[in-house]
């Protein structure tokens, strides 16, 4: 069955899970998760796979081993298209609506070093600055893990100091749960944003590349 949109029950399910993040709630409402969240997300990513690649759906369970927050379930459903290990495209559904992103969410130490070296050099740093400026101008957010201070060895007046602070970098756009979210128009919205991330992804895969080192 093709993608037809996300039903109201998906948002009701996550609103309830935010209020009661417990095994009892999840077990009692698991049919809503299966039918209104997981199945439509699979249909959505399957419809986009021919153009962007196969997506991995994340499990609904949180890893709480090293977290102070022991809530057992994620309050969103995400899916990721891995273009180069760690660099790719993302789509997420939660009680607040739909979110898409593209970039690198975590980087190993060698990737951070390559990223900063490329940003530092005008020949590669200026194109990234232009990509980021154009994404912001088009209404996308630019996010990622950032240092509060400047990296060691970088002068205070570096023209790309803000980008150099990043340890990860991705662009994103959030959509409120408007009526179109219940229709196949979701495909168009996700496709448009994923195409918009292409220049950033190309820059990252060219200059950062994948890593065999442990991620931070």
Residue ranges: model-predicted function:
Residues 1-16, 41, 86, 141-216:
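Long, solvent-exposed, polar/charged low-complexity segments
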Residues 10-11, 15-60:
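Active-site acidic/histidine clusters and adjacent loop/turn architecture
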Residues 28-33, 104-105, 115-119, 182-186:
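Short histidine-centered catalytic/ligand-binding loop motif
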Residues 26, 95, 167:
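Residues forming anionic-ligand binding surfaces in small-molecule and nucleic-acid pockets
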Residues 96-155:
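Compact, glycine/acidic-enriched structural inserts
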Residues 53-90:
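Hydrophobic/aromatic-rich structural module bridging two neighboring secondary-structure elements via a short loop
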Residues 62-64, 83, 95, 106, ...:
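Short, flexible loop/turn elements at secondary-structure junctions
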